[in-house]
UniProtKB/Swiss-Prot annotation:
<dbReference type="InterPro" id="IPR027417">
    <property type="entry name" value="P-loop_NTPase"/>
</dbReference>
<keyword id="KW-0315">Glutamine amidotransferase</keyword>
<dbReference type="GO" id="GO:0003883">
    <property type="term" value="F:CTP synthase activity"/>
</dbReference>
<feature type="binding site">
    <location>
        <begin position="188"/>
        <end position="193"/>
    </location>
    <ligand>
        <name>UTP</name>
    </ligand>
</feature>
<keyword id="KW-0665">Pyrimidine biosynthesis</keyword>
<dbReference type="InterPro" id="IPR033828">
    <property type="entry name" value="GATase1_CTP_Synthase"/>
</dbReference>
<feature type="binding site">
    <location>
        <position position="54"/>
    </location>
    <ligand>
        <name>L-glutamine</name>
    </ligand>
</feature>
<dbReference type="GO" id="GO:0005524">
    <property type="term" value="F:ATP binding"/>
</dbReference>
<feature type="binding site">
    <location>
        <position position="465"/>
    </location>
    <ligand>
        <name>L-glutamine</name>
    </ligand>
</feature>
<feature type="active site">
    <location>
        <position position="512"/>
    </location>
</feature>
<feature type="binding site">
    <location>
        <begin position="148"/>
        <end position="150"/>
    </location>
    <ligand>
        <name>CTP</name>
    </ligand>
</feature>
<dbReference type="GO" id="GO:0004359">
    <property type="term" value="F:glutaminase activity"/>
</dbReference>
<feature type="active site" description="Nucleophile; for glutamine hydrolysis">
    <location>
        <position position="383"/>
    </location>
</feature>
<feature type="domain" description="Glutamine amidotransferase type-1">
    <location>
        <begin position="294"/>
        <end position="537"/>
    </location>
</feature>
<protein>
    <recommendedName>
        <fullName>CTP synthase</fullName>
        <ecNumber>6.3.4.2</ecNumber>
    </recommendedName>
</protein>
<feature type="binding site">
    <location>
        <begin position="14"/>
        <end position="19"/>
    </location>
    <ligand>
        <name>ATP</name>
    </ligand>
</feature>
<feature type="active site">
    <location>
        <position position="510"/>
    </location>
</feature>
């Protein structure tokens, strides 16, 4: 029987529910259990695909082409699992499916209401994740905080789950904040008491508390919280601010979190405890890196940390392999000019230009890429970065001065980057991109193929609607550009490289989505190898 763990949050947002859920997932997985991660987002958008990165952060893409919350990236990187369309559900998706059923007459004339129709659809999404994965454990994170009006249907649905699948098969974990008042040098438990009271008022009694705090919580405060919340003191877990993300699962294990979860759910794991030795070595390496490598990231959304979180994480993963700390200098593309690019790049070991949409900042990206190419600074382009590298090459090597992308200038004479043929007639923005996992055939003798351990074919995740214009392929090749990765039918350019440079590779896909702390993605691995000049070191 599948076990269901629901992770909720109270007091404030951004408490780290996703990290808590991921860390528990990692511990259970390392006990030999099959774990599926799931995130419920209470916003009414169908998905985050059309949302402003400044509001939502990065849009994560799964193998099956789902545009999802960035927490799925945490799940994949920390737990080392692959997520899917069943892993991210929004209020918008729920209402869309319910309304489609109503229009088809599936409800046979009944009045469609939040209870039972919306809550039943939410439960169906939870159950579907279990049925499609055959998992031992489903860990579902509920976005927002307890008491939010948007989260109410989700809270009601998970309350009902206890009755539907049995009390022994459901566990509620509630994350709260225990703030420290510096003026009084005192920790306050009242916010946690109120948050749990709110949760209990809707019929959910938490079975475990995870307390976020700046410093360790003494026994007196834990006893007080236990008295007020009816949660046994041995199931109150501290989540102290940690210097490294890798510390969190290890700290949870020290407190016996995974064992307590297994005991509560009567869950027998293949291994008596989580084997975290490899994780400990990774944590030790991450804390004691002996070198530094500076990478300049030129992007459109650099003011928000979460906008490029998979990219910066992938850079760090590669850094662990080379025993080097990656210092990422984020530069707003709009601020770059021919006059200041040398100053911006003077101490940089490498340049990365990640994905994005729209026309803002494109000229700054092109200027930065030109500087990297002319000065043989290792360069990695991703999605929009690949497109701008192509435009830069056309302008400054092929001397096509008006070369551009059709996204920036639809009527451009030399549109090096053009809209994909099957996307020309699309009227909507949402859900109309080339999304998900696609194969690419790698050319023999290229640095790209070497980066992927000489594989013939790779599978990578995409999110774009523009592509390289094939009518320029011959001219590019004559000028020295190598198309080192193409679609199996040779119709789509997936990767370009300049073989005479130290490292100048750009990909139409998003390699960052498949990077893992213990398995850096191929292009990132080779990019940091070239930028650092260091030998790889096994963990």
């Amino acid at each position: 029987m599948t076990k269901y763990i629901f992770v909720t949050g109270g007091v404030v947002s951004s408490l780290g529910k996703g990290i808590t859920a991921s860390s528990l997932g990692r511990l259970l997985k390392n006990r030999g259990l099959k774990v599926t991660m799931q995130k419920f987002d209470p916003y009414i958008n169908i998905d985050p695909g059309t949302m402003n990165p400044y509001q939502h952060g990065e849009v994560y893409v799964t193998d099956d082409g789902t545009e999802a919350d960035l927490d799925l990236g945490h799940y994949e990187r920390i737990v080392d699992v692959r997520t899917s369309k069943y892993s991210n559900v929004t209020t918008g998706k729920i209402y869309q499916e319910v309304l489609e059923k109503e229009r088809r007459g599936d409800y046979h004339g009944a009045t469609v209401q939040v209870i039972p129709h919306i809550t039943n659809m939410i439960k169906k999404k939870i159950m579907r994740a279990a049925l499609t994965t055959d998992s031992d454990v489903i860990i579902s994170e509920i976005g927002g905080t307890v008491g939010d009006i948007e989260s109410t249907p989700f809270m009601e649905a998970i309350r009902q789950m206890r009755r539907e699948v049995g009390e022994d098969n459901v566990m509620y974990i509630h994350c709260t904040l225990v703030p420290l008042l510096h003026a009084a040098h005192e920790m306050k438990t009242k916010p946690t008491q109120h948050s749990v009271a709110e949760l209990r008022s809707i019929g959910i009694q938490p079975n475990m508390l995870v307390l976020r705090a700046e410093q360790p919580i003494d026994q007196e405060h834990k006893d007080k919280i236990s008295d007020f919340t009816d949660v046994p003191v041995d199931r109150i877990i501290e989540s102290i601010d940690a210097p490294s993300l890798f510390d969190v699962p290890l700290e949870f294990q020290k407190q016996g979190m995974d064992q307590k979860v297994c005991d509560f759910l009567h869950l027998e794991s293949p291994k008596p405890e989580a084997d975290m030795e490899a994780w400990k070595k990774l944590d030790e390496r991450a804390k004691n890196l002996e070198h530094k490598t500076k990478i300049t990231l030129v992007g459109k959304y650099v003011e928000l940390e979460d906008a490029y979180i998979s990219v910066t994480d992938a850079l760090q993963h590669a850094g662990y392999l080379y025993n080097t700390k990656i210092e990422v200098d984020k530069v707003q593309a709009e601020d770059i000019t021919e006059d200041n690019i040398a100053e911006i790049m003077k101490d940089s070991d490498g340049l990365i230009v990640p994905g994005g949409f729209g026309t803002r900042g494109l000229e700054g990206m092109i200027t930065a890429i030109k500087y990297a190419r002319e000065n043989d600074i290792p360069f990695l382009g991703i999605c929009l970065g690949m497109q701008m590298a192509s435009v830069e090459f056309a302008r400054n090597v092929l001397n096509l001065e008006d070369a551009n992308s059709a996204e920036a200038e639809p009527n451009c004479k030399n549109n090096i980057i053009d809209i994909m043929a099957d996307k020309r007639d699309e009227e909507n923005i949402g859900g109309t991109l080339r999304l998900g996992l696609y194969p690419a055939t790698l050319k023999e003798g290229t640095k790209t193929r070497e980066a992927y351990d000489n594989q013939d074919v790779i599978q990578e995740r995409h999110r774009h609607r523009f592509e390289f214009n094939n009518k320029y392929r011959e001219a590019f090749e004559k000028a020295g550009m190598v198309f080192s990765g193409v679609s199996p039918d040779n119709r789509l350019v997936e990767i370009i490289e300049l073989p005479k440079k130290k490292f100048f590779i750009a990909a139409q896909y998003h390699p960052e989505f498949l990077s893992r702390p213990q398995r850096p993605e191929g292009l990132f691995k080779s990019f940091i190898g070239a930028a650092s000049g260091l030998p790889a070191q096994k963990f």
